[in-house]
């Protein structure tokens, strides 16, 4: 069985002067519960891309690539976690196993990990991380003769600084969603078993995540990142424009499969827009609104880039 080692993406070319070259590597991230899966499915419907089936995470999680490169995690410890956690781990909330094992054969994992350790021992941690990523995931693209790969681990934009250094050919999409809906969704997902447990905690959690992401965008350079509002993508008069700008950022011509998925499947009823109003008692709506407005004010004062998108959605809903 081929291991897929030592294969890398090669940027494509286009003759369209108004269209960027297609990126061979597209990272899509957000706060969590923000719509990254929706955006990745839209763009993953294009013939350019193969979408990684689920979050790979080894390049973004604590103990992953950023910590290896910063010297906070040893290559040996990283390799242990890769083999024993990121490749396959049990998720109690879903009563199922998750991880790379669904699409990375054990033989490929072992060969790629051994090669990673050899490169680290040779004093090349950056090259080791970069090649490990391609060794594990690029075969997904070659299996379907695709020229590019989409990866949607939640923290890819928050960790855009080190990832942009490792992958200079990559671009990033930050998916933004109304913070009240994100907070309500996250609280519902936690089911009182973990933080955040209340709407107030949910908004605090969301603000912290947004700030981490903005720091990642600054580290990578704003020209490498496109911010897209899920709320604009599913409803309103900016829907088509939002889709077009996102497509152009990735360097994609329109295709029937991608446009068809967008027009048929990406709708407001599927996005659970304003779900917070049904999740939160009516008597608490004014308090939640006030807290959210205060957060947006703080983010504006600190120059956080996505606030314009968030305010536009809020103003449209308040009108």
Predicted regions and their residues:
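Anion-recognition interface
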Residues: 78-97, 101-106, 157-163, 197-211, ...
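PAPS-dependent sulfotransferases, especially Golgi type II membrane carbohydrate sulfotransferases
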Residues: 1-27, 187-190, 214-223, 227, ...
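Catalytic beta-strand/loop signature of glycosyltransferases that borders the donor
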Residues: 52-55, 258
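P-loop (Walker A) phosphate-binding loop of NTP-binding proteins
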Residues: 30-31
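A conserved segment at the C-terminal end of the G1
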Residues: 37-49
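PAPS-dependent sulfotransferase catalytic domain
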Residues: 116-131, 136-257, 274, 278-279
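PAPS-dependent sulfation machinery
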Residues: 55-149
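Conserved catalytic segments around the Walker B and adjacent sensor/switch elements
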Residues: 50-53, 226
């Amino acid at each position: 069985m081929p291991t897929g080692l030592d294969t890398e993406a090669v940027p494509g070319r286009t003759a369209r002067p108004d269209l960027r070259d297609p990126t061979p590597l597209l990272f899509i991230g957000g706060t969590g519960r923000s719509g990254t899966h929706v955006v990745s499915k839209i763009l993953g419907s294009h013939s350019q891309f193969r979408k990684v089936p689920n979050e790979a995470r080894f390049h973004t999680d604590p103990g992953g690539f950023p910590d290896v490169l910063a010297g906070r995690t040893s290559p040996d410890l990283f390799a242990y976690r890769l083999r024993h956690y990121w490749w396959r781990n049990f998720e109690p909330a879903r009563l199922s196993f998750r991880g790379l094992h669904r699409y990375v054969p054990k033989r490929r994992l072992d060969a790629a990990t051994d090669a990673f350790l050899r490169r680290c021992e040779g004093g090349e941690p950056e090259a080791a991380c970069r090649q490990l990523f391609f060794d594990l995931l690029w075969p997904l693209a070659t299996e379907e003769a695709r020229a590019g790969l989409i990866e949607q681990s939640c923290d890819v934009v928050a960790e855009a600084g080190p990832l942009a250094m490792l992958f200079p050919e990559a671009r990033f999409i930050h998916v933004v969603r109304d913070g009240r809906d994100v907070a309500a969704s996250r609280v519902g997902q936690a089911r009182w078993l973990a933080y955040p447990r209340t709407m107030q905690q949910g908004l605090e959690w969301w603000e912290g995540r947004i700030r981490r992401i903005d720091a990642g965008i600054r580290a990578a350079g704003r020209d490498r990142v496109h911010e897209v509002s899920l709320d604009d993508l599913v409803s309103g008069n900016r829907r088509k424009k939002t889709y077009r700008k996102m497509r152009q950022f990735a360097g994609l011509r329109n295709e029937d499969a991608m446009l068809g998925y967008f027009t048929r499947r990406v709708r407001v009823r599927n996005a659970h827009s304003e779900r917070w109003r049904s999740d939160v008692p009516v008597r608490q709506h004014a308090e939640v609104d006030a807290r959210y407005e205060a957060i947006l004010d703080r983010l504006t004062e600190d120059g956080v880039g996505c606030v314009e998108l968030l305010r536009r959605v809020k103003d449209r809903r308040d009108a």
